[in-house]
Amino acid sequence: MTGLRGYESGVVTNETHAQVMRQATARRATLPALLTDAGYQTRAMGKMHFDLVRACYGFESMTLPIDYLRSCEKQGQRPKTHGAMECELVPALSTVDTRDSINTWIVDGSIDFLETRAPLRPFFLWTSFTKPHPPFDPCRDFWEIYDGIPMPEAVYGDWSRDLDAAPQGFLAGSYENTDVHLYSPQQLANTRRAYYAMITQVDYALGRLFACLRENGLDKNTWVIFTSDHGEMLGDHHMSQKNLFFEGSAHVPCLIMPPRGRGLPVNRRVDTLAELSDVYATILGIAGVTPPENTHGVDLREPYEERTFYGNSLDVNFCVMDGGYKLVYSACGDHTLLFDMVNDPMEQHDLAALPAYQEKRRELFRMLLEHTAKTRPQALENGYFRTSPAPSRPGDVGFRWLGFHYHDFNYDVFH
């Protein structure tokens, strides 16, 4: 939304963005504000996770998951609760058919916008699906697609396979929200089946959206960018959810489809690292809008060199990637892991304690510490990360009660 990384804007949790977003909107520096001011018809459809809920932050119009509930209630058809918690990974089939599901409602609204938009203005449509996000409650017809199909097994490393010996600071967030570390192989397979089913429903929904573009002749003048805010650990290394810089959580898709018929390059895979701030720069580049001076994203349509990546989540989990190596650090427990991402892309072999890699570990840790001192000094104390004790076992972490599915959350996330 702002072209800034979390540690640059100060948004390192879900609860810290309201003031930042208001200030950016006042400066007309949010992505939708810049596009609106450039003459675009801007529309948000689906999950936005904004605070305040109805704050548009530059969008001309916005329809949210809470509006799905309002529509259902007007028809006397509010979806029933199925007992799965907000962050639950144990599958629970949706209580509504696909045609009545929220993802279908979101793509229906997006198609409606394309068919009724202002014909003399360019448009920017942000379609944001709520799934796949816990609780894992796919619609039955998509769940059944994967009946009898073997699921990929969870990934474990030499540092994580033994749960008791694993660096517990990295696991604390998973303990707080799920009990995935107790799942049997069959339970993990069912969880992955549900995740695949929800992804497949998104795929079908996007097929309808792209068909609408073609039917209305918009595919010849529309760029499509598909990406996500985070992934899902899905039991890898005994972990769940997000907030971590391991591949399952942080490595998300970024697909760019150019307008058809212009002879632009297609079907290319680029292995150089990209980040979400680049999406901001890319969209503004497509629109011919100059990005604000304090943003650092690159236009992904153009060749660019590999960069050093720094990450901060919750002022607890940190990461630096440079030259094919990734160092991840947890201030909870003061844990450090080092991976060779070229030869070990699944992060199964920790190099941090090996004598041959001590210089690389010290170099990357120094880079991370110096970068944090410049960009997020409140995460440090006396020149070092502000640490906290790690749990010694799963039972040391209290389990959060996050509410039943279809509860109306403060930020209208409607998981």
Regions of interest found by a model, annotated:
Residues 339:
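Conserved histidine-centered catalytic loops in small-molecule metabolism enzymes
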Residues 355-391:
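A contiguous, mid-protein "functional segment" used to position or interact
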Residues 1-330, 336, 345-366, 395-415:
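Formylglycine-dependent sulfatase
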Residues 342:
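Residues forming the ATP-binding cleft of Hanks-type serine/threonine protein kinase domains
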